[in-house]
């Protein structure tokens, strides 16, 4: 099934949400960041305040849209992760985020193998990443505990990944990462403190539960 993806200027997405979504790697932490230069929503009515107070539904919708943009996930995938989360024992919001956090493209980004989730998706799609020693080209693959993720150094595009050993390791504790070797392992399931803190998963759960 063909899935539509946003292919326009990603900086517009950050401006629309009114906060940094870190979609462009190093640019997001520089003075060139669109939020710093144009701290207002895009469009012909930019700078004007929204009319009236946001409803509960509007806040839930905005939270869902923000999560989609941060993780570069389609609507059908979001709904799928919610359905999967409701079938598990535990807090639905936490389980929902665990599924998204364990997507291969997100794990590649979290490990520090890519500067953004968008770049991580490209790396996976182009065969630059292995899972348990085998090349994987599916960005949405959900990795499991003890899965090993590594850089496929036999690919022609591996130069993009050179210099990993010079970077600082900012990976979360649930990922045991060796940047010098270009390897990582899922040590355990991510908990609430290790996942994306800018997302209110409860609001997303409430949106889909209606």
Where do the PLM segments sit?
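Short, well-ordered loop/turn sites that connect or cap secondary structure elements
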Residues: 123-124, 143
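Conserved, well-structured core segments that form or line functional sites
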Residues: 115
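Glycine- and Gly-Pro-enriched alpha-helical subdomains that act as flexible
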Residues: 127-130, 135-137
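Ferredoxin-like alpha/beta domains used as RNA- or RNAP-binding modules
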Residues: 1-111, 138-210
